UniProtKB/Swiss-Prot annotation:
Native source organism of the sequence: Bacillus licheniformis (strain ATCC 14580 / DSM 13 / JCM 2505 / CCUG 7422 / NBRC 12200 / NCIMB 9375 / NCTC 10341 / NRRL NRS-1264 / Gibson 46)
Function comment: Endonuclease that is involved in the suppression of homologous recombination and thus may have a key role in the control of bacterial genetic diversity.
Name under which the protein is recorded: Endonuclease MutS2
Family (UniProt): Belongs to the DNA mismatch repair MutS family. MutS2 subfamily.
Chain positions recorded as ATP binding sites: G335, P336, N337, T338, G339, G340, K341, T342
Keyword list, A-Z: ATP-binding, DNA-binding, Endonuclease, Hydrolase, Nuclease, Nucleotide-binding, RNA-binding, rRNA-binding
Native organism taxonomy: Bacteria, Bacillati, Bacillota, Bacilli, Bacillales
Gene for this chain: mutS2
Amino acid sequence: MQQKALSALEFHKVKEQLTEHAASSLGKEMLLELKPSRSLEEVKKLQEEVDEAGTVLRLKGSAPFGGLTDIRKALRRAEIGSILSPAELTEISGLLYAAKQMKHFLEGLFEDGVEIPYLHQYAEKLIPLSELERDINSCIDDHGEVLDHASETLRGIRTQLRTLESRIRDRLESMLRSSSAQKMLSDTIITIRNDRFVIPVKQEYRSSYGGIVHDQSSSGATLFIEPQAIVDMNNALRQAKVNEKQEIERILRVLTEKTAEHTNELFHDVKVLQTLDFIFAKAKYAKATKAVKPAVNADGYVRLIQARHPLLPLDEVVPNDIELGGEYTTIVITGPNTGGKTVTLKTLGLLTMMAQSGLHVPAEEGSETAVFDQVFADIGDEQSIEQSLSTFSSHMVNIVDILKDMTENSLVLFDELGAGTDPQEGAALAISILDEVCQTGARVIATTHYPELKAYGYNRENVINASVEFDIDTLSPTYKLLIGVPGRSNAFEISKRLGLPDYLIGRAKAEMTAEHNEVDTMIASLEDSKKRAEAELKETEAIRAEAEALHRDLQQQISEWQEKKDKLYEEAEQKAAEKVKAAMKEADDIIQSLRMIKEDHKAFKDHELIEAKKRLEEAVPSFEKAKKPAQKKTDKRELKPGDEVKVLTFGQKGTLLEKTGAAEWNVQIGILKMKVKEKDLEFLKSAPEPEKQKTIAAVKGKDYHVSLELDLRGERFENALHRVEKYLDDAVLAGYPRVSIIHGKGTGALRKGVQDLLKSHRNVKNSRFGEAGEGGSGVTIVELK
């Protein structure tokens, strides 16, 4: 990426802002080295990493970087055999702790289902050296002090030191308390000079004290003397301190050697944690700038939605939509200076570089950026002072380099192209340069205040004009980019609002060429048309939003209505099922009553009773599987007793007995009588004409033969069970107390099916397999109620 472009677009300032979000000097170092990538795959990976870090920050608020410091210098010292200091070893322990915590943190999130595949890969790369961390922590505390229990030898030495110091202080304090010594001392304190305990003695009493003078006050009036009585103890103390130093050095050497054995792993952990700090800093920056992850492509297409310049205050910057590389590859922004053209140009260039560096861009969702092989920029008044070149010359030197190095996959930014020379010549050069760049297929944004370029977008393919909106009322630019509308100076309008007489403005307009006036008129018309279109679009969007809201409301109401309807239907089904069950129970009661009557009155045929009950059972509607069929309209014919009708509720034929209400009949269905609503009756035929009754002999129950055994051998399973049910009903009506069911032995499936049916049958009192003389397990003996 061209260094001049990075500098002109102030990419270094973005990096400076980034470093504020790093957790360590390692992260800051990596951020300051940040550069745009030219690889589409790498850019996608970098964007995903930042997006994953953003997810972690949203879920957890932060990542554990505590203890992360730059230990690389200490590791290099360990490699060459230098003894590391306690502070350096503490930093190494801190880094190992950071690696352990980060690994546990990221792997835990991944195991919980958080989508962070890239961050999880980094976590897997971390190498926790728990033993080395434990060894360091057992010898050195968090403040870099070697602990007493670092070794037994050190513990003994420090015990000796404390004992000696205590004895020396006790002896000196007794000297200070002596009444004879009070007048000879400058102060009753114990102090240390040259690492030895001393007391302050007045100069004139020097001869009264034996011992060694180690120092004197600045005035010379006080001498700091080590009394002879404690010289030996001070010597012993001094030797103990030497021993302590040697033991500490030995401990540090051992820890350093252990560290040196793992420098490769430690350097590796440093790099991984540095990269993670780098990634999370970018995610924090994205959050601070309200940036989003852009889609990226290699097609040279850029679409930034409500893009904001990241170096401008968030509450002041004006967002703009910028699109390039689709319908047009070149944008020419025209208009007066100080109109905000350069900000737009820099925004596109800087956001492109940010995206290629793996940074999210300050724009709205749906934004897309391209990965260019080069970004070239000729911006501002960067004169080459060393070469004593003019503004025009310095720009032209840069432009020549751009024309030489650009490709079809480059982004080229020209600010005030052709400025700094004669306007006509500058405009002509600008047009020629733009034609050359456009011919290569590069993506271009150029700003200019030359009116000659206003028509450029109308007579060139893949080129469009643009301008920055100017508010005549406030006499200031709004910084709103207007694509498709060339800019104009607005000099006449501004002058008029500032009080310039109309006649002077009229004279000035008269000096303008007719062609220029036509262009200005065209521009004004375009601006008005664009404003109207934007207003209509805004109104349309509002109507669409209202329609969508109404649609959602209707959908919700329909859904609620459907739920209510389904609930009512379920309740109706339940009530209907309950009524049918009640009717079935009533039928069972009727049959039971008929059995009792049968003992005294044998006029009823048993098989007719069973068939009548079966018809009633089959008439029960299946509410769970199908909806009740639509009822047919009852014939308007007036019903009368004796008419044959169809009971729609059960789908059975019956005979009207008598009318029991305004719209209710008593109906005979087989042997059953029940009350039915007239709306549930369908007329079939009128009652037959009365015939002369014939005497019919009643058929006795015993004339209807029911065998004492039922043979099921060879029957299909379902048919066999159906026969068992019918047989049991027949046997009950026949008055049998006990019957036999022959099912055979076979596979045992039929036998088990019969046994299961008998257990739940209402008329079975008990059942058992046959005895040896009754057929064994191939026969079941059934006792009836």
